A protein has these predicted regions:
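Core catalytic alpha/beta fold that binds nucleotide/phospho-ligands
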Residues: 1-240
Length: 240
């Protein structure tokens, strides 16, 4: 595979929220983010949101040279965030129970998703809007139990990461493409998808003992981008 320079890369920063100070993180977000956090019912959801948003501001600040609390975001019609004054800086944020991950790149649109590996998905509830008919058939033919749950988790995170990269809604975007290979018989840890006359790369893997991450990016040259890790003690994957 052709090598990739650091200038053509995705930087991932992530961690477990228990490793960060909630008080310090609270002071690292702006008032509308604090208001959003206060509306969340579960304390762990509040903590994950507060830590993730403050770390997003910190990481973007180091890249663009703007103080964290001065960074301004805008959103498209589907809620995808971008920077007001730095259109070439692309980022994506995902958080789940006690963990978060941030993807940042200067090169291309990017999306990331993280899920707790032992999260239980009810296939019947999500299949109708999340998976194509081929994907539903594939999952239904798997043995019930751990194998099906692992494949649902992999499929879900890959599709959500790509939808975030595309900047569309989950409901309208997830069924517009299939993650399965051409034979509709397996879900790959690395794959490329043609969507809307563009090429997107997807890569997935386990991180730490209990989390699963997928990253999607627009990859016009059919080259897997270099994944660079910052402050993550257990690297997820590295492609070059």
């Amino acid at each position: 595979m052709k090598s990739t320079s650091k200038e053509h890369s995705i930087h991932l920063f992530g961690g477990e929220t228990t490793g960060f100070s909630c008080e310090e993180s609270w002071n690292g977000i702006v008032s509308n983010e604090q208001e959003h956090a206060a509306k969340l019912i579960r304390q762990r959801d509040q903590e994950s949101f507060i830590v993730a948003r403050s770390q997003l501001r910190k990481q973007l600040s180091e890249r663009i040279g703007v103080p964290p609390l001065a960074i301004e975001f805008k959103q498209n019609a589907y809620g995808k965030s971008s920077l007001v004054d730095f259109p070439n800086v692309h980022f994506s944020l995902a958080h789940t129970d006690h963990a978060f991950v941030i993807a940042i790149t200067n090169d291309f649109p990017v999306g990331v998703d993280i899920e707790f590996q032992h999260r239980k998905f009810d296939l019947r509830k999500i299949a109708s809007f999340a998976f194509t008919s081929e994907e539903q058939t594939f999952l239904n033919e798997l043995n019930l139990g751990s194998n099906q749950q692992v494949e649902i988790l992999k499929l879900w995170t890959q599709k959500e990461a790509l939808v975030k990269c595309l900047g569309t809604s989950l409901e309208s975007g997830m069924q517009s493409f299939s993650i399965l290979n051409e034979q509709n018989e397996s879900i790959q840890d690395f794959l490329q998808i043609h969507q809307n006359e563009h090429v997107y790369s997807l890569i997935s893997g386990a991180w730490l003992p209990t989390f699963f991450i997928s990253v999607a990016c627009e990859s016009p040259d059919l080259i897997s981008p270099l994944i660079l890790f910052q402050n993550v003690s257990n690297p997820l994957f590295r492609c070059a």
